[in-house]
Regions:
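Assembly-interface segments of oligomeric complexes
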Residues: 244-300
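N-terminal hydrophobic membrane-entry segments
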Residues: 1-245, 299
């Protein structure tokens, strides 16, 4: 049997890269057939899947050299991605096929497991946000716009291969899925904002609570991203977030009205206004201060 090394770099633009015997240094075998004893190098930030006739038969998600042995039982090296990979392999590895030919067809897929950064987003239309302030009894819905960048990571390469990029012939690049992820992310913002609001976080304070927002988005997107595609949000950055001028003014007016309903605060506000008026009068050379004295508004 021959020996060859199949190694493909999973670049930031590539989610999946495939390498097969026909494009390797071993020319003694047939195209898309991996020789027994072949050595496959797996780099840091990569996962490796061996697919035979459209079925996943080997998984290596930790760096090092993997020796392909046709006589061994299917194996899973899950690395730091945990036992969920083994569970997924047990569930799908033996029963999911992708229309492979009856003949022997073997391919090596390299999955990018690094954080994929620089994914921009922006709300084309305002997103509802509930503003709650229990101190003043404020509970009102407003609309906000926001923009920024987020990053994601393929945390379950088996699910990503199975449900997203199965049997690509060359590379599956991020641009093939980015628009779909962005659309689903923007749809998830409203329920994620609801979770943030329940924590008592105001919309203006969200840039300081992006960790909580990323966690809330992962919860909302778990069915479509983590459980279906094996993808999770790593970070969610907010460059800016703002309500409309009308909504901001409405909040200020409601806050002011709530303050004035408090007798103590209302009295303090009146006293402050009187004090300001007296200071202005005292600075008036025409003697307006005497008018305040006559009305009993100047204290000694």
């Amino acid at each position: 049997s021959g020996s060859h090394r199949a190694c493909a770099s999973a670049t930031p633009a590539s989610a999946t890269t495939t390498s097969a015997q026909g494009r390797s240094s071993n020319t003694r075998g047939e195209d898309n057939v991996i020789s027994n004893g072949s050595v496959i190098a797996v780099n840091d930030g990569q996962g490796m899947l061996v697919v035979q006739n459209g079925k996943i038969i080997e998984v290596a998600l930790e760096p090092g050299e993997f020796v392909f042995d046709t006589g061994s039982e299917p194996s899973v090296f899950s690395g730091n991605l945990g036992d969920s990979i083994k569970e997924t392999f047990a569930n799908i590895g033996s029963r999911f096929t992708f229309g492979g030919d009856a003949g022997k067809d073997q391919r090596v897929y390299f999955i990018n497991t690094k954080e994929i950064i620089g994914n921009k987003y922006g709300t084309a239309s305002p997103v509802p946000f509930r503003v709650v302030d229990n101190n003043i009894g404020l509970d009102v819905d407003i609309s906000v716009r926001c923009n920024g960048e987020y990053s994601y990571r393929i945390t379950n390469p088996l699910l990503f291969y199975t449900n997203v990029c199965g049997n690509v012939t060359d590379s599956y690049t991020r641009d093939k899925i980015d628009s779909q992820l962005k659309s689903e992310l923007l749809t998830a913002l409203q329920p994620a904002f609801a979770k943030i609001s329940e924590m008592g976080i105001r919309y203006s304070a969200i840039p300081g609570h992006t960790t909580e927002l990323a966690r809330a988005l992962n919860e909302v997107l778990s069915a479509d991203w983590r459980d279906l595609r094996g993808v999770e949000i790593v970070s969610f950055g907010v460059n800016s977030i703002a309500a409309s001028q009308e909504d901001e003014q409405m909040i200020k007016d409601l806050q002011k009205a709530a303050v004035m309903r408090d007798p103590t605060m209302a009295a303090a506000n009146i006293a402050s206004a009187q004090s300001d008026a007296m200071r202005a009068a005292a600075a008036n050379p025409n003697g307006a201060m005497a008018g305040f004295m006559g009305m009993g508004m100047a204290g000694g």
